[in-house]
Design a protein with these regions (language model features):
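Active-site-surrounding "flap" and adjacent substrate/cofactor-binding loops of secreted or lumenal enzymes
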Residues: 45, 52, 56-109
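Short, Gly/Pro- and small/polar-rich lid/capping loops
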Residues: 25-36
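Noncatalytic, helix-rich "gating/capping" subdomain that lines the substrate-entry/channel surface
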Residues: 91-383
């Protein structure tokens, strides 16, 4: 489960490696309630309740080498992928009419499965792009290339997103976010502990490997590593910490375009916004404002050649999962094994499926819903959500430490929740997306451009609150603070989380936990900063806010005492689970 915060569209992915035999979908038993085989009754619940409750399940479901962790969510995702596979494979074997959604889904999946073509092509699909980066000669040309990569779903230096203005949530606004780190988190670059140092060395090896695969000499690869690490460490040094990123007020900086340009000269901003097709915007939200000022100073201390190495690596790393096996292996060895702890690459069909799910998410979702999600499930879920809203409202009313004024506002927010169940009322139109038989990467690239253009079309327009932040076939759920909505896609509304034929007690104990978790996000340390309309607004009395923080700190301390992670980063989900 997650709280949906705006996340920049970044090219990522999974591509080709080995084939896999077809496996029949395992249909979940419709009338199973609590499976006693999941228990370990040899252990007394008072001695080790976790082992008692989950021991049997863990024994019967050992960790698979393609996973770094495996639980009921992962098990449901596996079953979900098998279901979607049966829907898609027929389309790849018997494509529909040219230009139809079925043809696009089938062709993209088939290209992801075509290991012969992928390995014959090598890195030919990106050669023209590499040449374009290599010939950059001026700041304006560099700026245009940054915009091009952003429009193709990558995020060199920073990321651009269009979403709700957090203090005027009915309108969309251009938002700029810190980004540009291949390892994701700034701490990997800045900490000097043994683990961070090993991660940096593995990252350098990954960079070297990619540049070697495109024919760079050892000297060129070394120069690339030095340039990329110099730039990315500089980006890390001016990036907000994870704790600071959780502070909604600190990350809201709406200003005029002219005001933003006056504060930094990172790029030629007129050229950038023109290249992005946004010549007429007047305002933006520069999320981490000091980041862009720091990045401007960094750019002055790096050469154009160093910046070109950095952009080249952004392209290589983004495209690697969609190229030949050596590129896929390099990507998996670093991001899959080193960073994530997985021992084996997922089979080719799962990776191709993931690409199709990303490129034509709602088209696949429409097929999935028609096959696996009856209308009766939606009706039952709506009743459960209503019951749990009432239960949460009763709990809010009974809080002894909260004032009546804050309680009234909390009840208003709870009553105003937008509830989304199963699938959107209106499906997206993919007629403008071209899927061709040129190359797998070319199709991923076109898909990314299609998605970014879809997002850019919302600039300075009203927020469409009927849109979904997840596809129906996603095994997850979310709360979005700027729309004050809770969403439960069809794929999570399957056994063991939801079973329309099971006893109510089972459903309230399973999906009910998920519903309660997401609703509580509206009142956690981040969600509580947004009002019933989704605006970033302080609706708590000062005394109540202090009492909330006092209790939150105690919860954080409790988790700090038992787990070896920063409790501040887990508080949102910890609080929702309590």
């Amino acid at each position: 489960m997650k709280k949906l915060m705006v996340i920049p569209l970044v090219a990522a992915g999974m591509a080709a490696m080995v084939g896999c035999s077809k496996t029949p979908v395992k249909e979940a038993a419709k009338n199973d309630a609590i499976n006693l085989a999941n228990l370990d009754t040899a252990v007394a619940p008072g001695t080790d309740f976790y082992q008692y409750a989950c021991g049997g399940w863990m024994k019967n479901n050992p960790l698979k080498p393609e996973y770094a962790r495996f639980g009921t969510f992962d098990q449901l995702r596996d079953n979900n992928q098998e279901q979607i596979r049966t829907l898609i494979e027929g389309l790849s074997e018997t494509p529909g009419q040219e230009g139809s959604v079925g043809q696009k889904i089938g062709m993209l999946f088939a290209m992801g499965m075509d290991s012969v073509k992928l390995n014959e092509d090598g890195y030919a699909p990106i050669k023209d792009q590499l040449a374009e980066i290599n010939k950059l000669g001026t700041k304006d040309e560099l700026t245009k290339m940054v915009a091009t990569l952003h429009k193709e779903g990558m995020a060199p230096f920073f990321a651009l997103y269009v979403g709700a203005d957090e203090k005027n949530s009915s309108m969309n606004i251009v938002q700029l976010y810190q980004a540009g780190l291949g390892m994701g988190d700034r701490d990997y670059y800045l900490l000097e502990d043994e683990s961070s140092q090993k991660m940096r060395e593995a990252y350098k090896n990954y960079i070297t490997r990619l540049f070697t695969l495109i024919g760079s000499s050892p000297e060129q690869a070394d120069a690339a590593v030095n340039a990329i690490m110099k730039i990315e460490r500089g980006i890390a040094e001016v990036s907000f910490s994870r704790e600071d990123l959780r502070d909604s007020q600190k990350n809201y900086n709406k200003m005029s375009i002219e005001g933003f340009k006056a504060k930094n000269d990172l790029l030629n901003w007129d050229v950038y916004f023109e290249s992005m097709g946004m010549m007429d915007i007047k305002y933006l939200d520069a999320k981490q404002l000091s980041f862009y000022e720091g990045l401007s100073a960094l750019m002055k201390n790096t050469t154009l050649d160093e910046q070109k190495y950095y952009l080249t690596f952004n392209l290589l790393s983004s495209a690697a999962p969609y190229l030949s096996d050596p590129f896929v292996a390099a990507d998996f060895d670093f991001y899959g094994k080193t960073m994530s702890g997985r021992q084996e690459q997922q089979p080719r069909w799962k990776r191709a499926l993931s690409t199709v799910n990303g490129a034509l998410s709602e088209a696949v979702g429409q097929m999935y819903v028609a096959k696996y999600f009856p209308a009766s499930s939606k009706e039952k879920m709506l009743k459960m959500v209503g019951d749990l809203q009432k239960a949460l409202g009763d709990r809010i009313s009974s809080l002894e430490w909260m004032s009546d004024a804050t309680k009234a506002k909390a009840q208003e927010k709870l009553a105003a929740f937008i509830v989304k169940i199963g699938y959107p009322d209106t499906w997206r139109d993919y007629s403008g997306l071209e899927i061709k038989n040129d190359s797998y990467w070319a199709n991923v690239r076109r898909s990314n451009i299609f998605e970014v253009n879809y997002m850019l079309a919302d600039v300075d327009k009203p927020v469409d609150k009927t849109r979904w932040g997840m596809s129906p076939q996603t095994v997850n759920a979310y709360y979005n603070p700027t729309t004050n909505e809770i969403c439960f896609p069809a794929a999570i509304l399957q056994p063991p989380f939801f079973n329309p034929e099971a006893d109510d007690a089972v459903n309230y104990g399973a999906i009910g936990v998920v519903i309660g978790h997401e609703m509580t996000h509206g009142f956690d340390d981040q969600g509580r900063n947004y009002d019933k309309e989704g605006n970033l607004s302080d609706w708590w009395t000062a005394e109540d806010a202090a009492l909330f923080t006092q209790r939150a700190d105690r919860l954080a301390q409790q988790y700090s005492d038992i787990i070896v992670v920063d409790s501040c980063l887990l508080y949102t989900s910890d609080a929702a689970d309590e």
